[in-house]
Amino acid sequence: MFLNTLKAVFGTKNDREVKKYFKRVTQINALEGKYQNLSDDELKAEFAKFKEQILSGEKNENDILNDVFAIVRETGKRTLNMRHFDVQLIGGMVLHDGKIAEMKTGEGKTLVATLPVVLNAMSGKGVHVVTVNDYLAKRDAEQMSAIYNFLGFSVGVILSSQNSDIEHKQAYDCDITYGTNNEFGFDYLRDNMKFSKVEKVQREHNFVIVDEVDSILIDEARTPLIISGPTNRTLDGYIKANEVAKQMQKGEAVLPPAKPEGDFVVDEKNRNILITEAGIAKAEKLFGVENLYSLDNAILAHQLDQALKAHNLFEKDVHYVLRNNEVIIVDEFTGRLSEGRRFSEGLHQALEAKENVKIQEESQTLADITFQNYFRMYNKLAGMTGTAQTEATEFSQIYSLDVISIPTNIPIKRQDKDDLIYKTQNEKFKAVIEEIKKANAKGQPVLVGTASIERSEVFHNMLVKEKIPHHVLNAKNHEQEALIIQDAGKKGAVTIATNMAGRGVDIKIDDEIRALGGLYIIGTERHESRRIDNQLRGRAGRQGDPGISRFYLSLEDNLLRIFGGDRIKSIMDRLGIEEGESIESRIVTRAVENAQKKVESLHFESRKHLLEYDDVANEQRKTIYRYRNELLDENYDVRAKISQNIAEYSANVMNDYILDESGSNVNFENLKAKILYECSTQISEKDFENLSVIEMQDKLSQILENSYNEKMSRLEIKELRNIERILYLQVLDNAWREHLYQMDILKTGIGLRGYNQKDPLVEYKKESYNLFLELVNRIKFDSIKLLFSVQFNQEEVQNLENKANEENEKLLQSSVEMGASEDNLGEAEFKKVPRNAPCPCGSGKKFKECHGKSGPKQGILA
């Protein structure tokens, strides 16, 4: 009560914020006369002066906001015959300040965006405008380009149907770029798989405006963008490698200078295989290749290595078992079967080849990121939506975004009626159909909102029986739906739509419909989120139009059944509600809203919890991508990095074979074998006599440096640096993919630590950090091994970068991109789905029974 009194006297925080913005609106309005008296050329010249002030650093965007907004308003009048209202100016300022502008349906968010877009595009750093589907991205870019082009800005659009990097790069190089959240995110991931900077398509992440921000940053927060694909190894290679491995003879380790007999030696201590010179020669003959360790045969060499490990280091019924013709890992710590897990780096396929069972193609995560972490990369993030206040806390805590509710230009006249609640769903369905028939009889248009495609089908079938003409929209074809939803306000129209269908398109009505009471919104059940319900209500009553909204519920609805249905049921029983009768009560409506608040709170905590885990991986991702970008820079001193890695490798290897602290006892035989195998370099025990541990490490480093320099001496410096850079990148990428796989495994089982009275998040941070340290060392040491072992001819040297790019392109072409919800699944994505596979929309149905059907259905046409 006291809080309400304070609000009545001083206003809410939102009221005070809006009041501040209104003061500036007055200043902008005062400039309207000045700019409307200028010719087109004079207006453009005036704008160019302000742009030059930004580029020179003489002024910043806030200094010139009033003039720029006034110029954009005048430009809108001249090019589109549309004048920004005062409340739209407020919306523009809210967006420029990096906040969320909550603007009701029909208030012109698309036009509002032009104000901050123009202001922030003046720096030349680019502005991104994000929408939920391709249709809206293309529509908004085309509609607003008249304003942008008049003021000298270029506009690009990113569409999922575009297959060319060239098209995407051209769009990103524009001053203003429109596109979907999925495409922006995937382009970022793909850019961080490129082998040169010029091939990247995105520029700096400067300023982004996210339309329908609640859908993208809240609803899709738990859905990561993932590029996954098969490994680079063909299944045939494992079969060949298995046959070769069976013909190779195991030898015994001997002390140098004697050479081991046989084709390979087993290093059981380090669980490794060392192939002898004789073994290499035999393998090359059996494979029919000239050089097993050339770039072209690197995968084959790896497959042979794994095949030899499978035959000599992994024993059936000890390390794995065969069950139903599948290789299943035996956990080395518990002895239990680890069903669902697979050995990485092709070892599992090698074991399958060994046991002559079906070799399964293993997909791997090539790159991933959540929308939460992608959009937080921007220097400034802003958003627009009709519904954000219910999630204001989450926007503030997760994204540091304040939500400002913008007043409507004309007061809302829509009647939001209390819910009608029935005992059973069948009673509710009948009541909805009767209400549709009443409205339809007088010509009042009705929009029926459903929570699922399945419910849409129920009402579609019932309306067919009643012979009522109608349309059914299931968020399948955005462009076709947009055309249909525009007509949903016409006389006699009945439209059934899932929550997301046709979003972003206004439903307009004429005077005849206004006289009938406007558009009638019928919600067939409450969503778990109040925000989704508000979105449905908001389809009626745009720009001061009349309208009606009402929800029809039943005690069998999931929300009421799980959260609070007992209390409502007891009320209905006390009132003696009979079959077919409903209860309409503000108390009951509030009880439903309280149930929704419970669910919203649970979902918020879940998203927050997931983000805490993803933030750990995100810091690692940023570190790897930052280092990768350094390697792409031609001025980066990769040779210095290699020298540093050689020194660390030398110290690490030497420590493995020093048997006491003084360094007087060294296992030189195994050390020599390791250096010869991994670095193709022979060392002499004499070189290390009477040296301390540190001196021995330095000596080994010096020997390897000299060996490396000699190996590469025939190459020109520029060629050598390019080889080093490309090979280093390949090692980094492969190690990063393996790391993502290990992180997935860790995350899958980390929750079980809670049973041992340990905080899973703390444990996850510890173990992921250890995995990251292993990743860093793997990159350092594997790059050294590859650089020492690889052999190439001049043609391979010249085509190295092209070859790397071709292999990467093949990997991307065979990859699967998994992104956000069904509203973002366009035709291009659905075409890739097999008919009997689960539908990507998450309905649980087969694709052919869901989105695999033909486009939007029509009922009996009038």
From Swiss-Prot:
Q: Which Gene3D superfamilies match?
A: Helical scaffold and wing domains of SecA, P-loop containing nucleotide triphosphate hydrolases, SecA, preprotein cross-linking domain
| Subcellular location(s) of the protein | Cell inner membrane; Cytoplasm
Q: Which SUPFAM superfamilies match?
A: Helical scaffold and wing domains of SecA, P-loop containing nucleoside triphosphate hydrolases, Pre-protein crosslinking domain of SecA
Question: Carries keyword Cell inner membrane?
Answer: yes
GO terms (BP aspect): intracellular protein transmembrane transport; protein import; protein targeting; protein transport by the Sec complex
Identify the residues that bind Zn(2+): 839, 841, 850-851
Keyword list (alphabetical) reads: ATP-binding, Cell inner membrane, Cell membrane, Cytoplasm, Membrane, Metal-binding, Nucleotide-binding, Protein transport, Translocase, Translocation, Transport, Zinc
Query: What's the subunit arrangement here?
Result: Monomer and homodimer. Part of the essential Sec protein translocation apparatus which comprises SecA, SecYEG and auxiliary proteins SecDF-YajC and YidC.
Function, as annotated: Part of the Sec protein translocase complex. Interacts with the SecYEG preprotein conducting channel. Has a central role in coupling the hydrolysis of ATP to the transfer of proteins into and across the cell membrane, serving as an ATP-driven molecular motor driving the stepwise translocation of polypeptide chains across the membrane.
Protein's UniProt name = Protein translocase subunit SecA
Gene name? secA
